[in-house]
């Protein structure tokens, strides 16, 4: 092959490897005048045959470079065919005898003219410079990309500033004590539990945020390193372009050298006649040398065949290893599936146990509600019994007082009967005194009865008021119970949110590990690229050495032109065989590279599957231990429930027995009260009848006095006895008649119980309806608020889903964060109450904690979005690095071929 052909091939190879635009330019250059140039180059082969005799290996490499370069251009195959035909024709013509020397001189003149035309075209063509400009103008490794990435990295630090602002605000603000709207104190158990849960939640979120900030810093540092390495690669590419420019300069120098050689060729024509005789002797020597070289080439072919067989054996072994790895992979996948199935079974069991636990808890709550209701009813009955006992005692005291007064009246009656005999003279005075006494006595009894009725009414009103107060207290108690239930529900919701956040944190940690693995892979790729760059530099040095060898070969070409023409045909055949063997070797090498890459991938996949299997086995053992613990706790709870149910049943039975006793006592007391009332009525009637008898007796005494004066005392005494008997019968009848209306009056009084005030009832109903409407409005508002929160949580879960269920939240915190927590807990304040188990500051209220939670959640979302953008940027960097690697591989292949 000639020097011009070599120069054109090297320049086209270098310019094609840079950008696709250079490929188009080179295609356009070679498509127009390709056939003429290649014909000229084939004719120049007759002049430059000495080089192939001295260095056949270089010639073979150049032929390979031409064949591998042709597919990059349109119409390259036809041009190659033309060059081959031209070279064969030139070889046929070049094998001239000593007599046809004049024809050879005319043909050499034509070749000189064509060579000068090619050189003019090469000088006029400026495509290497334009290609270099395009590579620098449209290079993908511009610094604007790196500037954008650095600006994004700087924006990540905004999350840290936001966290510092939140901490400063929390430490600077002093909040007043907040009263709970339900009227419950802070020391109650439910609020303490709720605050503890909120504190744990905030601690976990702070741990997560600090860990994410540290990871962001690490990503930033890695990103800056990657950008610096990218800039270094770009500088190396610039150096490569500079070296290519130097090569172009050397090509120009070689063109000038070719012109000088053409001049020397003209001078050598005169010397050819003298050298013709010496050439024949040299040809014989060359025949001997070519025979030796043919033997060496045959040996090399045999070695290549042996290497080919060894590569085939290696390929078979690689296939066996790949099949074994596939089998192991399938077994591991089966184990993973079984482990996943067992995990699902365990999760289903845990769900069933949790459902049973909830059901038992509900039964326990219902039993507690029933026991409280029974206790309240018992308390009511006790109060009623106490009120009845007080009433009975009061009635007994009143009866005793009336009995005493009745005894006094009997004594007075006895005294009056004794004094009747003495009262004859004082009859007028006694009549007046008796009448006054009777009037005063009747008035006093009427006053006493009225006072007793008024007291009864007052006591009844007080009883009604007490009953209303008790009902109000019961309503208040029910409201408090409802508020407690609402607090329990909120506590459960908070616990569920905590669980979801923990799972999200696990996912975040898993993605962090993935990004770290990707970064390590990128580092390995960069190290490989550095090694490849060093290899390329070594190859450049070897290329310089080859250029020196080229110059030496040019000197040898002048001495060995005529001898190479006779041996071109044999060398071409050998070269074709060697090219075929090398192509096969390259294909086998590519195949072995693919096998090694597949083996590495399979090994990495098997390692990852083993790690996943270990994780699954650990999680399965943990779940089994948790299931056993849950079973033990369920057994304990069931035993406790049974014991409590038995105790409550015994208490209910005892209370029912006490109720029955108290009811019997109440019935007995009520019967006693009714009997006492009847006795009171009878005694009143007796008093009235005795007063009537006394009045009649006084009248009879007056009549007796009148009769004594008239002298008919005895007759009237007898009539007096009959009258007294008749008056007694009449008194008995009148007492019976009086008793019946009084009994009816008492029954009417019992029936005419003081009616309940309807206005009070209506007002109370209105109040209850208003409270019910307010509660309904609150419930509707809370439902809408819950729906909005659920929608927000669903949106946020889409962002965080990939970061959940992989790492435990306890492994996120570092020693530095623990020291900071200890320092803040010693200083006191809101942050100290977050980091400790007990509230260190009274300013930490529910509203404040919710605001802190919202701010921290916003910061967490920002950090997650920034992590996602960083991941995308890393992916783009990976694609660019892969492109660089491909570019370097192409350059290596071209340098090897050249």
From Swiss-Prot:
GO terms for molecular function: small GTPase binding. The keyword Phosphoprotein applies. One of its GO terms (biological process) is vesicle cytoskeletal trafficking. Residues 718-734 have a biased composition (Low complexity). Residues 201-712, 759-803, 855-894 form a coiled coil. Keywords: Acetylation, Coiled coil, Phosphoprotein. GO terms for cellular component: trans-Golgi network. Residues 1-43, 68-95, 702-749 are annotated as: Disordered. Residues 82-95 have a biased composition (Polar residues). Residues 703-717 have a biased composition (Basic and acidic residues). The modification Phosphoserine is found at residue 740. InterPro entries: CCDC186 (IPR038830). The modification N-acetylserine is found at residue 2. This is Coiled-coil domain-containing protein 186. It comes from Homo sapiens. The gene is CCDC186.
